[in-house]
């Protein structure tokens, strides 16, 4: 069927031998495989206790935890770990440390439930917020260089949607940070720890698909080594997906170009659902024309949004929280200002973020990164003039449905929480759901470390290091190779870039900050046609080695899967909740729509099911927060 090299992994030495064998293969198989000839692809087999896909914050934290528990762990990543998108996170990580004032994780939980517009699962939110202080102290012990107060404590800044005493005690200072480069500091710290614990990295390996057996158990993944064109089957007792979001489905996004929803699409192709994809966060302050992120921490340090008339307009929309209202509230308010003619610039299509009233030492010490970013991408000296900003796609609240252990779940019969054996997910790829319909700023870095760690702990509960694995089925990975071969030999008339641009325009125009039945129905029709056009894609490079044309085309298919499910899920949800704002259904409808959307991918068609929100907490340490009007 195909040439196969088996690489045992009972020792570190055998894996390095396998890497040597793999590095030599291109000498003997330099000609690319013929179209349709699966036997000409060379497969290298690996066996591990656990495999992590993705080396951002969630993937690295999972890998560290697995290694700490003694598991032989592989981490597959399509780019070098410290180039993962976690590096772009700026503002910080939330935890009720109480360094700036009295704080309580229950207050943090309340803010997160409220921020989620009551679509978040309260058991998972309780777990995350309760674990937050421990997670941050652990990062400090790992060596993360947090900013400090004068007395040496971790400095914490104000962030949107954060309060004291369940919303009645004023603004909370809960966001621990390393200036405005917290993600950079976090990622490098975790990578150092992963190296210390001897995690085996497979860098520049593009994960193609999950390896699922006939009883629905995940047994690993199959991946393409971009360096030499070989295919690799990673057989593992546990597979953890930490592949990030799919922001690049939109035309303007703060996401890196590598954020293509690969793990989501792998899950969808395996016949499993994706949850709540209609909830896409628009960050209020992307630089106009560039989309680069200006952290919410800029407003946390005292930055002010103004319209073309110089008015602090957020005072009208959120009289209490003002510029630090929840992100969906601020983004909608900004969009309304522009619609009503109070935008700035020749086209009146952006607003201003003022920082020039802040002391220069604050900008230098607390916001050095965005000061530099504004100078490069907007030509602005933040000490003298405002930054032109516009809401920009930033985060996907939806993703692969999981419980608070990180185990992937699906709808099976009458069980809405059926666990998929052997498969876990963490980070932006996952939907635990701790963010619900809207994520609070600085809860994302918390999410990745808490649930990356949770995945590792759960593996340790259900699996033993060195445990014998059930053999792979004979055809394991065959469909993935057929998929790869089909795309590599695509000979249509449309370049990948044109189809991608069409998709991005449809998503930007039809699934934006405000939505209507008309725009969403049109969006469903257009995105379906865009998917159909993918059948006419042309891949000009047939090689297997460093073939960026091939990789981008596979990433495009992954994006299209996410985009189609997003659009159809949004069209179906007849209410406004969090980031899903309908102009024709302006109210939240708890009676009919307090439920999670499950989108299934069926050969180009989207099928929707639903599962209930978890309203019960884990224990009696905190009571359930019942739904109420969401006001800031």
UniProtKB/Swiss-Prot annotation:
A GO cellular component annotated for this chain's UniProt record is: respiratory chain complex II (succinate dehydrogenase)
Its BP terms in the Gene Ontology are:
mitochondrial electron transport, succinate to ubiquinone; tricarboxylic acid cycle
- Look up the transit peptide and give its residue range: 1-29
This protein's pathway reads: Carbohydrate metabolism; tricarboxylic acid cycle; fumarate from succinate (eukaryal route): step 1/1
Q: Which InterPro entries match?
A: FAD-dep_OxRdtase_2_FAD-bd (IPR003953), FAD/NAD-bd_sf (IPR036188), FRD_SDH_FAD_BS (IPR003952), Fum_R/Succ_DH_flav-like_C_sf (IPR037099), Fum_Rdtase/Succ_DH_flav-like_C (IPR015939), SdhA/FrdA/AprA (IPR030664), Succ_DH/fumarate_Rdtase_cat_sf (IPR027477), Succ_DH_flav_su_fwd (IPR011281)
Binding, FAD = 54-59, 77-92, 262, 428, 444-445
Q: What class of enzyme is it?
A: oxidoreductase
| Membrane topology summary | Peripheral membrane protein
Where along the chain is the active site annotated? Answer: 327 (proton acceptor)
- EC no. given is 1.3.5.1
What keywords would UniProt list here? Electron transport, FAD, Flavoprotein, Membrane, Mitochondrion, Mitochondrion inner membrane, Oxidoreductase, Transit peptide, Transport, Tricarboxylic acid cycle
What reaction does this enzyme carry out catalytically? a quinone + succinate = fumarate + a quinol
- Any one GO molecular-function label of the UniProt entry: flavin adenine dinucleotide binding
Tele-8alpha-FAD histidine-modified residues are where?
85
| Reported cofactor(s) | FAD
Gene3D superfamilies xref list: FAD/NAD(P)-binding domain (3.50.50.60), Fumarate reductase/succinate dehydrogenase flavoprotein-like, C-terminal domain (1.20.58.100), succinate dehydrogenase protein domain (4.10.80.40), Succinate dehydrogenase/fumarate reductase flavoprotein, catalytic domain (3.90.700.10)
Q: Where in the cell is it found?
A: Mitochondrion inner membrane
Tissue expression as described in the entry: Expressed at a low level.
Alphabetical list of NCBIfam families matching this protein: sdhA_forward, sdhA_frdA_Gneg
| Assembly | Component of complex II composed of eight subunits in plants: four classical SDH subunits SDH1, SDH2, SDH3 and SDH4 (a flavoprotein (FP), an iron-sulfur protein (IP), and a cytochrome b composed of a large and a small subunit.), as well as four subunits unknown in mitochondria from bacteria and heterotrophic eukaryotes.
Physiological role: Flavoprotein (FP) subunit of succinate dehydrogenase (SDH) that is involved in complex II of the mitochondrial electron transport chain and is responsible for transferring electrons from succinate to ubiquinone (coenzyme Q).
Stated family: Belongs to the FAD-dependent oxidoreductase 2 family. FRD/SDH subfamily.
- How is this protein named in the record? Succinate dehydrogenase [ubiquinone] flavoprotein subunit 2, mitochondrial
**Native species:** Arabidopsis thaliana (Mouse-ear cress)
Q: What is the lineage of its organism?
A: Eukaryota, Viridiplantae, Streptophyta, Embryophyta, Tracheophyta
Q: Which gene encodes it?
A: SDH1-2
């Amino acid at each position: 069927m195909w040439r196969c090299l088996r690489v045992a992994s009972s020792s570190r030495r055998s894996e390095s031998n396998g890497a040597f064998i793999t590095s030599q293969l291109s000498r003997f198989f330099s000609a690319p495989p013929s179209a349709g000839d699966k036997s000409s692809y060379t497969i290298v087999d690996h066996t591990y206790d656990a495999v992590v896909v993705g080396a951002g914050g969630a993937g690295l934290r999972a890998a560290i935890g697995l290694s700490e528990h003694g598991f032989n762990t592989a981490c597959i990543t399509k780019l070098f770990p410290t180039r993962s998108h976690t590096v772009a996170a700026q503002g910080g990580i939330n935890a009720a440390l109480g360094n700036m004032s009295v704080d309580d994780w229950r207050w943090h939980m309340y803010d997160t439930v409220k921020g989620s517009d009551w679509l978040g699962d309260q058991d998972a939110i309780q777990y995350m917020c309760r674990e937050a202080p421990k997670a941050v102290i652990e990062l400090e012990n790992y060596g993360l260089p947090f900013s400090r107060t004068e007395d040496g404590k971790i400095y914490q800044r104000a962030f949107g949607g954060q309060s004291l005493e369940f919303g009645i005690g004023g603004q909370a200072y809960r966001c621990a940070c390393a200036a405005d480069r917290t993600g950079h500091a976090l990622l490098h710290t975790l990578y150092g720890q992963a190296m210390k614990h001897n995690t085996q990295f497979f860098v520049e390996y593009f994960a193609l698909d999950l390896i699922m057996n006939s009883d629905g158990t995940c047994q690993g993944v199959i991946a393409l080594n971009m360096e030499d064109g070989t295919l690799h089957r990673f057989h593992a007792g546990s597979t953890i997906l930490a592949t990030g979001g799919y922001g690049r489905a939109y035309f303007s996004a703060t996401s890196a170009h590598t954020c293509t929803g690969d793990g989501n699409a792998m899950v969808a192709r395996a016949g499993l659902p994706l949850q709540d994809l209609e909830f896409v966060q628009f960050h209020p302050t992307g630089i106009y024309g560039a989309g680069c992120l200006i952290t919410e921490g800029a407003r946390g340090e005292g930055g002010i949004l103004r319209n073309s008339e110089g008015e602090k307009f957020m005072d009208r929309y959120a009289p209490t929280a003002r510029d630090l209202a929840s992100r969906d509230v601020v983004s909608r308010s900004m969009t309304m200002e522009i619609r009503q003619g109070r935008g700035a610039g020749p086209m009146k299509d952006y607003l201003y973020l003022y920082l020039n009233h802040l002391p220069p030492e604050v900008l230098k010490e607390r916001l050095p990164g965005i000061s530099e970013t504004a100078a490069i991408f907007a030509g602005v000296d933040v000490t003298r003039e405002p930054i032109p900003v516009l809401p920009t796609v930033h985060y996907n609240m939806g993703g692969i449905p999981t419980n608070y252990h990180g185990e992937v779940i699906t709808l099976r019969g009458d069980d809405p929480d059926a666990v998929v054996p052997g498969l876990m997910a963490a980070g932006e790829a996952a939907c635990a759901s701790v963010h619900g319909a809207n994520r609070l700023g600085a809860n994302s870095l918390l999410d990745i470390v808490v649930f990356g760690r949770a995945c590792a702990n759960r593996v340790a509960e259900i699996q033993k290091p060195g445990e014998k694995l059930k053999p792979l089925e004979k055809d394991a990975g065959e469909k993935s190779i057929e998929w790869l071969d089909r795309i590599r030999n695509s000979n249509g008339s449309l370049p990948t870039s044109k189809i991608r641009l069409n998709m991005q325009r449809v998503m930007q125009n039809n699934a934006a900050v405000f939505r209507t039945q008309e725009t969403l129905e049109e969006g469903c029709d257009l995105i379906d046609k865009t998917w159909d056009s993918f059948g006419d894609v042309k891949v000009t490079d047939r090689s297997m080695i460093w073939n960026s044309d091939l990789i981008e085309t596979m990433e495009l298919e992954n994006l299209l899967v996410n985009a189609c499910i997003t659009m159809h899920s949004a069209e179906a949800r007849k209410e406004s909740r969090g980031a899903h704002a309908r102009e024709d259904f302006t109210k939240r409808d708890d009676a009919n729509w307090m439920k999670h959307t499950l989108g299934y991918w069926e050969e180009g068609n989207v099928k929707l099911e639903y599962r209930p929100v978890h309203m019960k907490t884990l224990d009696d340490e905190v009571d359930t927060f019942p739904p109420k009007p969401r006001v800031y």
